[in-house]
Amino acid sequence: MNKNKLERVQQKKRILVAPLNWGLGHSTRCIPIINALIAHGFEPIIASDGLALELLKKEFPDLKAIELPSYNITYSKKANSFKLKLIKDSPHLLKTIKKEKRAIESIIEDENIFGIISDNRFGVRHKSVPSVFITHQLRVLSGSTTWLSSKLHQKIISKFYECWVPDHIGTNNLSGDLGHIEGSTSFIKYLGPLTRFKKLNLEPKYDVFALLSGPEPQRTFLEIKLLKELENYNGKVLFVKGQIENEQKIEVKNHITIYNFMTSKELEIALNESKMILSRSGYTTIMDLAKLEKKAFFIPTPGQFEQEYLAKKLHKENVIPCCKQDDFKIEMLETLKDFSGFKNEEYQVNYGKLFS
């Protein structure tokens, strides 16, 4: 056997893991999958762009990381303009998907890729390599055009080998109508919620943990509003901006401790040490808080139908209170006593079977 063939035999099977760079949720929910791949003898290669890529590089400094073409997804300043902005940006998105496909062809050849795991990146797939798509949105809400956006999304998903949904399959689920549809679902696998965190028995250190995330400019708008409101809060506050930068920065303003970002381990400890969480209603955040059985107050990203739906669903189920971004007042946190908070349903992802 020649040297090149011997190297290929001895080499661990390489799996490309590529989350979408839209907020930090797609990248953070890939962390337990990457850890599981390593534990099962695979060699993950990370591929993304922007903050999502930077976050995973900090979490896995020893893994190879590849930059993919950027979708450059941002929110409009006005919530009611979000759908129009997506329509306007669609030619750029389609061009980016084509660039992604070309990039994937090169990566597969150069890196000897055995499998692909794409978290909501449409162009990260290849007909010669088993490619799976991770999403909690089998149904994509878009107001009056939900039927169209859902059909288009399902058509894209059907081009993948499998679709992994990070939720429970039964009625006691987190994603509701988003992650559960009628009809042929033979290629859909329900993993159970994905989270990088564990529940720890720690004494409370913070009364409120304000955890920010999501695309600009809405992330900044929420940061400004919450910092102003929390000035008048009578309690100890931890505030994480969700800005991934080269160096961690910590600032203390009276009763508020402000971080630009935290590592996964720091977040795990901080969440466990906090009495209540103030955040967006992103699905990854919901999975994390369900695992930790936390109480939370949600402020959905303006104009994002998915987050608005999830917040209203959980409010209706008496799990959490929520409100619109412009309406939030610090006094609203007092309503948490009237809600149950999250309860965890024990489960374990069978990664061995999943990766087989």
Locate each region found by the language model:
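A nucleotide-sugar donor-handling region in carbohydrate enzymes
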Residues: 135, 140-217, 240-245
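A short, glycine/small-residue-rich beta-strand->loop->alpha-helix junction that serves as a flexible
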Residues: 19-31, 217-220
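Leloir-type glycosyltransferase catalytic cores
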Residues: 88-93, 319-356
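Conserved nucleotide-sugar donor-binding subdomain of glycosyltransferases
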Residues: 81-123
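Catalytic binding pocket for nucleotide-activated donors in carbohydrate/polymer assembly enzymes
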Residues: 285-286, 290-332
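Short amphipathic alpha-helix
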Residues: 27-37, 52
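Conserved nucleotide-sugar phosphate-binding/catalytic loop shared by glycosyltransferases and other
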Residues: 11-14, 21, 39-40, 44-91, ...
